[in-house]
């Protein structure tokens, strides 16, 4: 059996909440509202939504941001929720006592929630570098990101 290994990502951080006492369907309803949004916007949305499932998801997003700032040194203003998924967990089965010695089964569903935050400043720096390479007079050989055009005084031609 071949297992897919996770690639090491230098721009993303995740937080995983397991066995959260809520149905996966209700959690997905909240997760769909925050997927693709920035960290601060997602926190605002989660605080104002009137669902019971918002609080555990709020704690997960907050925990993922704490992981990002502590472990990788990312700024919270540059974080975006790139991936948010909800998987169904175990179903806890209980018995509710009823009249005449009978009992009714109660099924308590759980879910596993994964929140992945990504730092967008890395992509902005990459786009700036690509825009720099498209400028006339700049070539890919200049690794130190300094551009010398032919009309400027000094530069490479003054050195002998």
UniProtKB/Swiss-Prot annotation:
Pfam families: Ribosomal_L22
CDD domains referenced in this protein's UniProt entry, alphabetically: Ribosomal_L22
InterPro entries in the cross-refs: Ribosomal_uL22, Ribosomal_uL22_bac/chlpt-type, Ribosomal_uL22_bac/org-type, Ribosomal_uL22_CS, Ribosomal_uL22_sf
A Gene Ontology cellular-component term: chloroplast
A single MF term (Gene Ontology): structural constituent of ribosome
SS bond partners: none
UniProtKB keywords: Chloroplast, Plastid, Ribonucleoprotein, Ribosomal protein, RNA-binding, rRNA-binding
Localization in the cell: Plastid, Chloroplast
One GO biological process term: translation
Protein family according to the UniProt entry: Belongs to the universal ribosomal protein uL22 family.
Assembly and interaction partners: Part of the 50S ribosomal subunit.
Function: This protein binds specifically to 23S rRNA.
Protein name: Large ribosomal subunit protein uL22c
